[in-house]
């Protein structure tokens, strides 16, 4: 079959290092340190190239550098250009597990090859517990296919049911399937996709990226830690860093709330966030309904180093008796039991023994304006709680299968039977090795000039901002700030949630009712990463983010937006 591969040239802005990729895949670097026009020579394919005769029907298992039984490819299909995506070729495939017992599932993956390719590839991460192939056309990251990326991703080796239903749960007790979710599927999918890309374009990508959010953010950190030779740049939003403990954390709260006296009800939400605002809003220099100085606020409410300290003393009910448990106002009081629960939620949780990479604590949550979010507060009594009816429902949440299946080995188990340091301790350590992206040594990734951009929000109640901050601090402690600043940024956006969106609170720290508006948080993380990787344009420690006609500096940890002289600028403590 006659191949239709032609060169496409684009000349972009000045860069520090120029690479020329010709039609034979040769790479010619400009002299390092010089400034020259960036010249990217890509390739095109047409519908005639989108065929099994070109990309094949299988990939040898030896090509995949994690254990697999084989890789099969479905017949490619060509999608013509539309308003939402350029013309591209789609190849679906399946990576067979080594374990054929039934619990381990095939990893279903997809590769999208744009008609006009700029020698870039990006692996897109998943979300939640995975189970579906992510949207590969571009989504919120600016239509990646239009930017000349070949895109690829997988379901990580298990399959959800219709809609958001979890599907079969037998995979949750299979070690190969769990390790696939944790890390192996990333390498397996990468290696299979590279084989497809090379067959289609007759060369491998010049630049290789990983972009992910939430579970995908954790996966981004994972590839930088485990497979640093495969990627030039990683963008990881709101990563679920300590995944094994994040799944357990809601159960730790429910275990704390088994005694009815410890139950924090939804009626207390306004009192909780009102106290956060009262103590923390003005720590950045301005009472405006936004807690910008997140680290100082965290220090006030984290009692892990001094359990006798009580940041909630001003909210304690007189004589430990709540005169009106149904009071939903900011003036509502808290009992000693409720205060004990809040101390748990907003302090570092200490493990019985250190987990993978010597991690001794889980950061839990930061003071926020959504204290009932993501199951931190539940509305009804649950099975196992004092006074709950026998028919009360078992507490459940997005990651509960990771507790009952991964940890306890029985998806029907009661997660509230967990005891820290108890009979599941060895399994806890094993899962931490497979699932937690906590290795602070990124020296191999850095030595290859890899670039890492992480963005988090302090109002996140799905992922743990505390764990995210503690991980990045461990990288700084291990490698030194000067070295880390050469290749990584952790951008922290105060008071935005898991989707990096949020508003100021309607009552400021001085008790005044104020207008509510969006917090600036919009920025193009992919372009920021491309500029750093391909053009040597290092992002500043402060990047302007927007929301409509509003703008703010987005600060790189450990800086925060401080108000002085009529405006905000990034400052450190």
Segment roles from a protein language model:
Residues 128-202, 248-249, 410-434, 496-516:
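Cap/lid segment of the alpha/beta-hydrolase catalytic domain
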Residues 9-22:
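Bacterial N-terminal signal peptides
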Residues 454-456:
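Short beta-strand/loop motif that positions the catalytic acidic residue
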Residues 462-466:
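Conserved alpha/beta-hydrolase "acid-adjacent" motif
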Residues 26-120, 133-139, 287-291, 300-412, ...:
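Catalytic-loop region of hydrolases
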Residues 217-228:
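Short glycine-enriched nucleophile-adjacent loop
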Residues 96-179, 183-187, 214, 225, ...:
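N-terminal cap/lid subdomain of alpha/beta-hydrolase-fold enzymes
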Residues 203-214:
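Alpha/beta-hydrolase fold nucleophile elbow
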